[in-house]
Amino acid sequence: MATSATLTTTHLSTFRNILDEWHQNRSKTTPTKGFLVPFEELQQSSKKDALKDVIVAFRTRPPPNEAAEKFHGDPDAQDAAETEAASAAVEFCSGITVTSAEPGVFFAHVPGMKWSGPTLTHKPYEADLAFGPDVGNEEVYQRTVVASDILSLALSGGVGCILAYGQTGSGKTYTMESVEHRVARDLFDQARMVGKRLVLAQGGAQASDTEAGDIFEFNVTFLELLGKHATDLLESTEEVDAQGNPVRTAIAVREDKVGNVRPNLISSLIRTSEELEELINKALSHRRTSATLRNATSSRSHALLTISIKNKLLPYADEGQLILVDLAGSERHEDSKDHDKQCMEEARDNNKSLMNLKECVRAKAKMAAEDGFVHIPWRSNKLTMLLKPIFDIESRQPSRAMIIAHVSPHIQDSVHS
């Protein structure tokens, strides 16, 4: 039987001893595997991923200094001895072990309780990549976004999507903001490279950097989806709610007469990396946050940055899209039991939309691996409707989704992981 976070904290020293023994036994038989190409050699390497339609990477962050403080005893606990023991156990204990970086494998160490005492179940999970707590943002970006050629795909008229998924407090926003700023840094350089190749392919002379960069037109929108309500993060407003968050006009999310899902958002024409950086910073400053049990500044919403790319050299070509999504955190009942009514409803809607998203991702991966028709239920939720470009099986545009799944490092969260 799985244990609660409070009960896990009470027996933390026992779990730590079990975990140490597991690590010792495993190290004797199975060494930890790293990445196939060292980070220092990554940019010079010709190795590319198989470029599947759906690529999944795990990431776990290092624990913050206050790691254990979040799991001190429950003040409402009836057993005073249990609370006292929990409060004394302030040392961090990891619930995640990455055993292979590429292909990615990690073990979740799930606490349990039997008549004989505390137990740990070591459950393995596999993905394309796995990033441990010692891997920095630049390496994550290079091994995910760059290695999967997502920028080139979008510049070539396809759809590239990067999603940060995970439990509240697991580090999604930290990762996605770093990805957004690195995309802003690299996108225009990549556009000039692709533009030069296009000019040569059309029989033209070697184009200058300016001429190659002018081939593409970039328009940017930034949408926030909070529960069932969508708003425009680029809308300026001075009105705030009781929590100090800005109040914005509700945006409708629906298909138009020809089947496109294009909310009526402010679209900004961007010409340089600096302009894109400024826009990202402006939008992120408008995003709604609130304090939760797990995070003092938790992002309670899904945030979708969409960069539409028009090729002026080939005006009849499909418009490419780059969609960067920082998803709201998934929450267990234990994490949300202290929320007010509004936050409870938001958490419920967020969990439902994340479940719908998982169904769509699984169906898309299954469609790529098997022959025959596979239904992708993207109309089931506003979030998946906004991601129609990567889920619509009738679309002629190539698409690729990179999912960075964040796993909390705390053993108290292993059940959720």
Where are these regions (language model features)?
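Extended, charged alpha-helical "arm/stalk" segments used for dimerization and assembly
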Residues: S399-S408
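P-loop NTPase motor catalytic core
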Residues: A2-L36, E102-G104, A108-R400, S414-S417
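Acidic glycine-/aspartate-rich tracts in secreted/extracellular proteins
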Residues: P63, S408-I411
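Long, basic/Gly/Ser/Thr-rich N-terminal segments
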Residues: M1-K114
